[in-house]
Every structure is written in C-alpha cells, then in structure tokens.
Regions:
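Signature aromatic-anchored transmembrane alpha helix within multi-pass, membrane-resident enzymes
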Residues: 1-26
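C-terminal luminal/periplasmic domains and tails of membrane-associated envelope-modifying transferases
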Residues: 29-71, 76-176
Length: 176
C-alpha cells in the first residue's frame, strides 16, 4: 500500500508539473496565463509552419530553429539554428547551409514571461542581424521565416521580414 501511494503521488506530482510544457494543451501553466493560444490558433500556426518549410527543396542543407527540426529530420544536412549556420561536408570542407528556417512566433510568444524563451529570442535576433548580407528572405508566413543563401530577395517577403523583426519583444535587460 505504501508503495502504491508513493507511485500515485509521484505520478500526480510529475504530471501536474507539466515537464517541458508537453502537456500544456491539457494542463494550463496557470489559471490566468500571460500568453494563451487556443488549440485552433496553434493548429493554424502549425499548418502554416509546415507549408513554409515545404518550400525548401528536399535535398538542400538547412539550419532550423528547435520547433521546426522534427519536421525536417529526414534531411541529410540539418543543424540547429541559431547555434550553427555552417556544417562540415563529407570532404571535410566547411559549407554554409543553403536555407534557414526560423519560427519567430514560437520564440517570441513567451519571451515576455519566460526567461529561457527571452534568451533564445535574443540569440536568434542577434544571429539573424549578422546574416543579412548572406541570406535573404524567401517566405514569411505566420511568424515562420525562410531565408535562402546568396539569392535575390523576394521583395514581399523582405518587407514582411523587416516588419516581423520590428514587432519582436525588446529585451528589457539591455535597456537598463
């Protein structure tokens, strides 16, 4: 009986703590959350993100932000953005990735309330600013940005990209 009670208590505490936000659809983070998105909005954003990454040719090298990686996992070259934008090919040469896919909506959604998301967003913003010369926007859809290496910018995507970057939350720690 004692062991059954201990197991029951550990399951209750483990599931109610919502590890890594995996149960957020079922267990809210709070009664009155600072950022809320309905399941329908989440579904629409997911569909937009998948449609955006489908514009990247299948055999291209990609650097993607964390929420997009599972959808691109079958790629021969897939690295995590913002930590890497270059990879070493089979010949031992360093190569820039052809495409970058970033879900800015995901990273900015909780940036005001969660320090981890705020740090990730700042790192992403800094890296994106440094890539303006090499990469140009090809598509911006519901906060998902697709950038291509050494190509002519899509004017509509470039404008949407600049607007999106300006709308991102500003890091309060840097201003003080």
């Amino acid at each position: 009986r004692i062991w059954a009670g201990c197991i029951g208590l550990s399951l209750l505490l483990g599931l109610s703590s919502n590890p890594n936000g995996t149960l957020s659809l079922l267990i809210p983070n709070s009664i009155s959350p600072w950022s809320y998105r309905s399941p329908l909005e989440q579904w629409r954003h997911g569909r937009a993100a998948i449609a955006a990454i489908k514009t990247i040719p299948e055999h291209s090298s990609v650097s993607a932000s964390t929420p997009l990686i599972p959808h691109l996992a079958a790629r021969a070259v897939l690295i995590r953005f913002p930590y890497h934008t270059e990879y070493t090919d089979r010949k031992g040469s360093d190569q820039p990735v052809e495409w970058i896919a970033v879900d800015l909506d995901y990273h900015s959604r909780h940036a005001k309330s969660v320090a981890k998301h705020r740090r990730n967003l700042e790192k992403i913003k800094g890296e994106l600013e440094g890539l303006n010369e090499e990469y140009s926007p090809k598509l911006v859809s519901d906060g998902v940005v697709i950038l291509k290496h050494d190509s002519e910018p899509n004017q509509e995507a470039a404008e949407a990209y600049l607007n999106l970057l300006q709308e991102l939350p500003i890091d309060q720690e840097r201003k003080t």
